[in-house]
């Protein structure tokens, strides 16, 4: 990846030299830049010197993200050189032909990246044939925290594919399809038309199950065409690579035939770019042996009948064995030496070997070459001439086969554009066959897509969890959010009851719908969202010196600053990393902020153990309470995993602790303590707090929607006027230190007793 920072803009060029993919875009903020880094996960970044002064945390890139970052000399980033480099490489007359009219920084980044690759790869980069500009507004934005929390492509703990969304969806048969599907998962669409095109093709494949299964059968033997053609163009492909390539090409005609059965705009587009490459397949089948060696210098690469000279030299090599056998028989008969043998080694070539018992019968025209303990080795003029013929033909044959192989490889490389287009078409059909298969096997439904902001999921299921559980049944749940009276759902209930799973499943269903996939639900009507944010769990970031609470607050700050009214927020246990009062205050204020359409107004699922937040239902029109249903059996509980309307009145923390195996002595003591604390419950106080920041009987402040977010304390439960007056009356100048200490102790006790 190359990043160029010029005039508050970042030009970003990204390539994968193994496949020839080359992308370019521009962004105008550090946050958007980080989103692109998360999208592509580059291993190396080159940049201009001003990038180091742009405010981006480059040390974080190197240490946390594991990216090698280095600045290039300024001459790499000249305007004239950039234009010249791109026009020359892509063989066009103007940048307009590349679609780069609006990408000034992107042009410089792309050209600098090409120049860098010329120098480091030491080749012409002939597999990079297309530069694809894209707008970040074309895709849903998912930041690194949300990608991690939703476990899109790997699990949070084990960093494994199994247990991720990609693991569920990926039933692709080719490496190209697997890469493309991953990019779909990481880059959901926000264009309704494009989403519906994908849905149409998946529906078509579901309706034609026989066609779908036949496509899978023919896709299976196809090797990684994108990387094979890269090796071919870089002249590193060996004979076995060419056979793998040929075997892959043989699968293309039946796939093309099956594609004729599919309807729709996307299917038509795939067919148009699908070249069966029959001429290349015929060339390889006629020229390369079916089981060639790995090395191009080992010979036996070219098929008999492809080249007359190869056939002649190969016959000479084959006939040479007969010639040697005839010579051996003739010399035995002439000399009477019955155990005479013609042998070969790399030092002496061919020679006649005679044991010591017959050496007296050796004729004068035998020339001794080597004496052994039990034998003598000789050559003759006739054997030497025969050796020159045989070995010379073998050397010439190996060299000729190598030259012919290179010519064939170059012919294939000249067709790189056709091959890459077909490889992309194969990858696309592989992805949609996989998504159709998963939809059918897992009983997914085709979601409706709307632009009105309504998210209505009936019988939704978590796509990963339902595949991981073995001896239990996954309980489905409904979700309803819109841009009006159902903007925020506050979800309460005990730990382990399923709040986090429910919220994640809702986010994943929305994301899957915008991929174009079917979704795990009875029915779904999904309003397109521009971003998904998740704040689920937190841990210390010791490397940067941040506590759990600071990590949490950083994530919340990022969400509140970057979310829009069209975003979906998944917020779990906001404020739990600090004291109860501070945490509740922050959570309350966050809900108020999100609910205000003039400030944010995003659709939100908000899980909390602060039951006091349920008082916001009725105070804020857009807030609704939901909880996880629990069945009590004495001191025990059963999690029903069902989301129901209303707020939970208990956290069941002690019961969960009991399930976890906490000693009974601790459980009993906890029950005693909770009973004492319940007497000082603040819930009744919270009921009297208005979202306008006023308590009963006090002067009304301006409404939140009208002015600002200024709030009174949620916990105005202690009347301290008498203590304040007593402090005013204290005559400090006439008190001894001991008197002052006693007075302080007395006032402190009064305050403690009131709490």
Region spans (language model):
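Conserved catalytic alpha/beta cores of large enzymes that bind or transform nucleotide phosphates
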Residues: 42-51, 56-59, 71, 382-415, ...
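Amphipathic heptad-repeat alpha-helical coiled-coil/stalk segments that mediate oligomerization
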Residues: 77-85, 92, 141, 247-322, ...
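Short hinge/gating elements
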Residues: 23, 91-102, 151-155, 165-169, ...
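C-terminal tails and terminal domains of large nucleic-acid-associated
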Residues: 713-755
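Charged catalytic and DNA/RNA-contacting regions of genome-maintenance
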Residues: 1-204, 220-233, 237-329, 694-705, ...
């Amino acid at each position: 990846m190359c990043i160029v920072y010029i005039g508050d803009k970042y030009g970003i060029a990204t390539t994968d030299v193994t496949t020839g993919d080359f992308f370019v875009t521009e962004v105008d903020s550090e946050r958007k830049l980080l989103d692109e880094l998360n999208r592509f996960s580059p291993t190396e970044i080159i940049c201009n010197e001003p990038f180091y002064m742009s405010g981006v945390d480059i040390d974080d890139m190197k240490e946390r993200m594991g990216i090698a970052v280095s600045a290039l000399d300024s001459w790499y980033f000249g305007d004239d050189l950039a234009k010249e480099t791109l026009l020359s490489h892509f063989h066009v007359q103007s940048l307009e032909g590349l679609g780069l009219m609006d990408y000034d920084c992107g042009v410089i980044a792309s050209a600098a990246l090409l120049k860098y690759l010329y120098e480091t790869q030491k080749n012409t980069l002939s597999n990079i044939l297309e530069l694809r500009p894209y707008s970040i507004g074309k895709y849903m934005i998912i930041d690194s925290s949300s990608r991690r929390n939703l476990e899109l492509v790997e699990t949070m703990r084990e960093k494994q594919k199994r247990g991720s969304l990609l693991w569920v969806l990926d039933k692709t048969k080719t490496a190209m399809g697997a890469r493309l599907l991953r990019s779909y998962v990481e880059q959901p669409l926000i264009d309704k038309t494009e989403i519906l095109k994908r849905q149409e093709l998946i529906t078509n494949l579901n309706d034609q199950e026989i066609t779908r299964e036949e496509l899978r059968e023919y896709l299976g033997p196809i090797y990684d065409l994108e990387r094979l053609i890269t090796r071919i163009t870089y002249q590193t492909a060996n004979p076995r690579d060419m056979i793998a390539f040929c075997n892959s090409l043989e699968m293309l005609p039946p796939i093309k035939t099956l594609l004729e059965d599919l309807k729709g705009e996307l299917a038509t587009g795939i067919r148009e770019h699908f070249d069966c490459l029959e001429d290349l397949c015929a060339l390889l089948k006629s020229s390369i042996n079916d089981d060639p060696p790995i090395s191009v210098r080992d010979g036996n690469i070219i098929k008999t009948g492809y080249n007359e000279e190869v056939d002649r030299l190969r016959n000479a090599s084959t006939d040479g064995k007969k010639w040697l056998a005839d010579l051996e028989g003739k010399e035995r008969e002439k000399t009477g030496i019955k155990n005479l043998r013609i042998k070969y080694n790399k030092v002496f070539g061919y020679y006649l070997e005679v044991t010591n018992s017959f050496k007296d019968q050796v004729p004068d025209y035998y020339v001794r070459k080597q004496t052994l303990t039990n034998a003598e080795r000789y050559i003759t003029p006739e054997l030497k001439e025969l050796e020159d013929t045989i070995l010379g033909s073998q050397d010439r044959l190996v060299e000729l086969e190598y030259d012919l192989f290179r010519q064939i490889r170059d012919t294939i490389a000249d067709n790189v554009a056709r091959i890459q287009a077909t490889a992309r078409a194969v990858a696309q059909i592989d992805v949609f066959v996989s998504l159709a298969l998963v939809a059918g096997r897992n009983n997914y439904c085709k979601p409706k897509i709307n632009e009105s902001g309504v998210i209505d999921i009936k019988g939704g299921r978590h796509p990963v969890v339902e595949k991981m559980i073995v001896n239990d049944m996954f309980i489905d749940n409904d979700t309803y959010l819109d841009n009006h009276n159902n903007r925020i759902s506050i979800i309460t209930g005990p730990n382990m009851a399923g709040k986090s799973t429910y919220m994640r499943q809702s986010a994943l269903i929305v994301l899957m719908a915008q991929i174009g996939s079917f979704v795990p639900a009875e029915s779904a009507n999904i309003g397109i969202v521009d971003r998904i944010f998740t704040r689920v769990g937190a841990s210390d970031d010791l490397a940067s010196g941040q506590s759990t609470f600071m990590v949490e607050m950083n994530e919340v700050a990022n969400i509140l600053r970057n979310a829009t009214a069209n975003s979906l927020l998944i917020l779990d246990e906001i404020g739990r990393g600090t004291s109860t009062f501070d945490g509740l205050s922050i959570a309350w204020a966050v809900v108020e902020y999100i609910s205000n359409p003039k400030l944010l107004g995003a659709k939100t699922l908000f899980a909390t153990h602060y039951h006091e937040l349920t008082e916001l239902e009725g105070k804020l029109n857009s807030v609704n309470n939901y909880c996880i249903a629990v069945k009590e059996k004495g001191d025990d509980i059963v999690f029903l995993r069902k989301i129901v309307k209303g707020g939970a009145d208990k956290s069941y923390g002690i019961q969960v602790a009991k399930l976890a195996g906490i000693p009974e002595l601790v459980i009993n003591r906890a029950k005693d303590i909770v009973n004492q604390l319940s007497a000082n419950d603040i819930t009744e106080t919270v009921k009297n707090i208005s979202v306008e920041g006023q308590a009963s009987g006090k002067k009304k402040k301006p409404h939140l929607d009208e002015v600002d977010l200024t709030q009174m304390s949620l916990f105005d439960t202690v009347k301290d006027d008498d203590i304040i007056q007593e402090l005013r009356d204290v005559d400090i100048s006439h008190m001894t230190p001991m008197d002052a200490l006693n007075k302080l102790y007395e006032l402190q006790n009064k305050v403690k007793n009131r709490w």
